[in-house]
């Protein structure tokens, strides 16, 4: 009987339960993640250029895109989001080379994965960070990403503003 119980417990429930639990979660995260990123997000980079050649951060990164991302990450606590930004803020204050800043940005990914694993953040957060990391090529991009994150954090901290 013990062998049958072990075989049944190991074989049937694990095989049947794992797909039943994981499949909807994985399918939901995989299917919904690309849909949730705003259309055209990062397609033209962080910056626009004036007629005279001056580069400036596109306003949607601190406006429309930041507000949209904050509403999609609304289930996340603002303190958890701010903990992701902590190392980025430290690297901004110091005179560091670009590589050190890029490392600080890259450190957000494992922290985001941990938050998603603990169900404290949606899977969209990981996709969002990966997409942004792929577009950071220099200090200007890093600072644009940082400003974008701070705007998202601001909207997350004030949910009443988003709903109005």
Where are these regions (language model features)?
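Small/polar/charged residue-enriched interaction surfaces, especially the RNA/DNA-contacting tracks
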Residues: 1-164
